[in-house]
Amino acid sequence: TTPIMFALGKAYNVTISRDPLGRLWQPFIDNVKVATDRQAPLFLVMVETILQSYQTRVAAINRQMRAATTDIVNLSPKDITTFVEYERKLNDYLDALIPTNTALEKTLNTKFKLLPLREEDQEMVEDLSVDIEQVIARCKSLLRTITNVRDSYRAVMDTRLNETMRILTVATLALTIPTMLAGVFGMNVEFPFDTHGIGAFWSIVFVSVLAAGLISFYFMRKR
């Protein structure tokens, strides 16, 4: 977004902005037909054009978010980065639309006398105010959706991390038993049974594998 200042004179309307807005005003000049003998209708049509630009962009963000959030479990970090960018844009839109709506509503207040309005102009201002409020409501709804998606993604990531840590812990315990048995029987210590024969070797291997399997089975089942 970029700020625009409207200067309304008796014979002309002037817009001033820090950035070139050819993409906004050139289609307006080419396609919109509006009487220029009165400043109020021209100003309101220009505001309507700006509002339509916001409506188009918010609708595009809504479509892209609906497509990206069909499966929360398969969201990627890139999707979360995109949502953060959407959040920034939506907050910028709110920062622009809320003051604009306030200024429009003030034109209806005869105490301020900001702009001479006829009855049809007042109806157009009211319609624009309603449309702006709808866009504001949609922006706030999308921001809530982004917050919910990020919370859900964080919960999914926490669950995956806990599952990974549990599996690693079980694997560590399972590998500890064969290592411990190998260390014990590898010591130069006399045992009451033969530890040098082939049968003793396979017995130790069998006990190690059985113990590791039982521990893994127990902790994998205990969730």
Locate the predicted segments by residue:
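Extended amphipathic alpha-helical scaffolding segments in membrane-proximal extra-membrane regions
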Residues: 2-156
